[in-house]
Design a protein with these regions (language model features):
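Structural signal for interior beta-strand "rungs" in well-ordered beta-sheet cores
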Residues: 85-192
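Terminal amphipathic alpha-helical/low-complexity segments used for targeting or macromolecular assembly
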Residues: 1-88, 199-233
C-alpha cells in the first residue's frame, strides 16, 4: 500500500477511535447524572448535579484518569486523580475499575484503592473505604458486585467479594466475603439477612461489640480456671 494511503488509513483509524472515546465519555456522563437524579431526592436538575455534586465530579475525573492509566500514561493519571482528591475530598486510585451508574453520595472521606473493582449501579456514602489490610500482594482491594449499597463510614478491607444486591450497614467493617442478596452489619461485619430472610436479631442499632464479646470470653475463661484450681485443692 502507498505511504499516502497508509497515512490516510491511520488518520481515519485515529478519528474513529477518538469519536468512540468521546461518545463513550458522554454516554457514561449522562448515565451518571441520571443515576444521581434517581437516587438523590434532593437533586433538582442535571445542571445542578454536574456543577455542584462532588461525587459526580470525582467519578467523572476518575473515568478520565483511568483512560490515561490504561494507556500507561501514569503521571497524567495520578495528576488528575490528585486534582480530583483536592477538589472533592474523595480519593480514587486511577487504576480502580468502576462500572456504570456509580453514585457517591455526600462523598467526603471516600477512599477507593488501586485494585478495587466496582460493578454497576453501586452507591457508596461518605467515609467509605475500599482498602487493603496490608497483608496481601497483587489483588489487595475488594470486588463489589452490582446493585450494592455501602453505608457511611463502612470499611471493606482486603481482596474479598461483596455479592450482587447486598447492603453494608453504616460503620460496618467487612473482612470476609458477603454473599449476594445479603445485609451485613457490625464490627466485624456479620450477615443478618439473606435473600429476604432475617438470620438473627441483630440490626443497625444492636451492633455486636467486639470488645464486650472479648471481655465476656475472658471472664468465662477465668471462671473455668478458678474451678480447676479449686478442684485441685
Amino acid at each position: 500500500m502507498e505511504p499516502r494511503l497508509l497515512r490516510l488509513r491511520s488518520l481515519l483509524t485515529a478519528e474513529d477511535f477518538l469519536f468512540t472515546e468521546v461518545f463513550c465519555v458522554f454516554k457514561q456522563l449522562r448515565e451518571d447524572i441520571e443515576c444521581v437524579k434517581a437516587r438523590d431526592p434532593a437533586a433538582r436538575s442535571a445542571i445542578e448535579i454536574y456543577f455542584l455534586y462532588p461525587g459526580l465530579k470525582a467519578v467523572r475525573m476518575h473515568r478520565l484518569a483511568n483512560k490515561f492509566y490504561n494507556k500507561k500514561m501514569y503521571f497524567m493519571a495520578r495528576w488528575i486523580s490528585q486534582r480530583a482528591s483536592k477538589k472533592t475530598g474523595i480519593e480514587i486510585h486511577p487504576a480502580a475499575t468502576i462500572g456504570k451508574r456509580f453514585f457517591i453520595d455526600h462523598g467526603t472521606g471516600v477512599v477507593i484503592g488501586e485494585t478495587a473493582v466496582i460493578g454497576d449501579n453501586v452507591t457508596v456514602y461518605q467515609g467509605v473505604t475500599l482498602g487493603g489490610t496490608g497483608k496481601d500482594t497483587g489483588k489487595r482491594h475488594p470486588t463489589i458486585g452490582n446493585n450494592v449499597m455501602i453505608g457511611s463510614g463502612a470499611k471493606v478491607l482486603g481482596p474479598l467479594e461483596i455479592g450482587d444486591n447486598s447492603r453494608i450497614a453504616a460503620g460496618a467493617v467487612v473482612l470476609k466475603d458477603i454473599p449476594p442478596n445479603s445485609t451485613a452489619v457490625g464490627v466485624p461485619a456479620k450477615v443478618v439477612k439473606r435473600d429476604g430472610v432475617k438470620l438473627d436479631d441483630l440490626d443497625q442499632i444492636h451492633i455486636p461489640d467486639p470488645v464486650a464479646n472479648e471481655i465476656s470470653r475472658l471472664e468465662a475463661e477465668i471462671e473455668m480456671l478458678k474451678k480447676q484450681i479449686n478442684n485441685k485443692e
